[in-house]
Structure formats: structure tokens, C-alpha cells
């Protein structure tokens, strides 16, 4: 039973969430890159002029945002992994301190 003032963390869950975030991030990136590839492959003979230029602007902005999303999701997964490692280490340090203090009794 844990007390209300204790820190509890499920390290396996943290690692799992980081891995799932990475996997989904790669899936999203692949889908977005496939879409950009299809849109970039539309020949100029299909459409042109101002509409094509504006559409290309939208595609460029969308591509930039999808790249930003990829980097942000990657940073989130890295942060989760870092937090898991830091919390695990802190727990081990605290356990050693408690064991040492108990040995002095």
C-alpha cells in the first residue's frame, strides 16, 4: 500500500508509451510523406496558374508543419525515456540511502 506523499511510477509503462509514441510518429510521417509525394507528382498539365501556386504554398506549409510534428513527437518520446531513467535512478539512490540509514539503527 502506498502513502499519499510517495512517488509511484510504472517504469515499464513509461518505456512502452515512449516506444508507442515513436512507432505512431513513424507511421504518421510515412503517411504524410506519401501524401506529399502524391501531391508533388501532379503534373503541371493537370492544373496551373494561381490555383496551382496557392496549392503549392499550402502543401509547402503543410509539409513544414508535418516535419515540426515529427520532431515534437520525437522530443516527447525522448522526454518520457529520460524521465523514466531519472526516476528509476532516483528510486535506487533513495533505496540505498534508506538501507544505509537502517543499518545505522
From Swiss-Prot:
Keyword Glycoprotein: no
InterPro entries associated with the record: ESAT-6-like_sf, T7SS_ESAT-6-like
UniProtKB keywords: Secreted, Virulence
CC terms in the record's Gene Ontology section: extracellular region
Complexes and interactors: Forms a tight 1:1 complex with EsxT. Complex formation results in induction of alpha-helical conformation and stability against chemical denaturation.
Additional free-text comment from the UniProt record: Elicits strong humoral responses. Induces significant lymphocyte proliferation and up-regulates the induction of TNF-alpha and IL-6 in tuberculosis patients.
Descriptive protein name: ESAT-6-like protein EsxU
Taxonomic classification: Bacteria, Bacillati, Actinomycetota, Actinomycetes, Mycobacteriales
Amino acid at each position: 500500500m502506498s502513502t499519499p506523499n510517495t512517488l509511484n511510477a510504472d517504469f515499464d509503462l513509461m518505456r512502452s508509451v515512449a516506444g508507442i509514441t515513436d512507432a505512431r510518429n513513424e507511421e504518421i510521417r510515412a503517411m504524410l510523406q506519401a501524401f506529399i509525394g502524391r501531391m508533388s507528382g501532379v503534373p503541371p498539365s493537370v492544373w496551373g496558374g494561381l490555383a496551382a501556386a496557392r496549392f503549392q504554398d499550402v502543401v509547402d506549409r503543410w509539409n513544414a508543419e508535418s516535419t515540426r510534428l515529427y520532431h515534437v513527437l520525437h522530443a516527447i518520446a525522448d522526454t518520457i525515456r529520460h524521465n523514466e531513467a531519472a526516476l528509476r535512478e532516483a528510486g535506487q539512490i533513495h533505496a540505498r540511502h534508506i538501507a544505509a540509514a537502517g543499518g545505522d539503527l
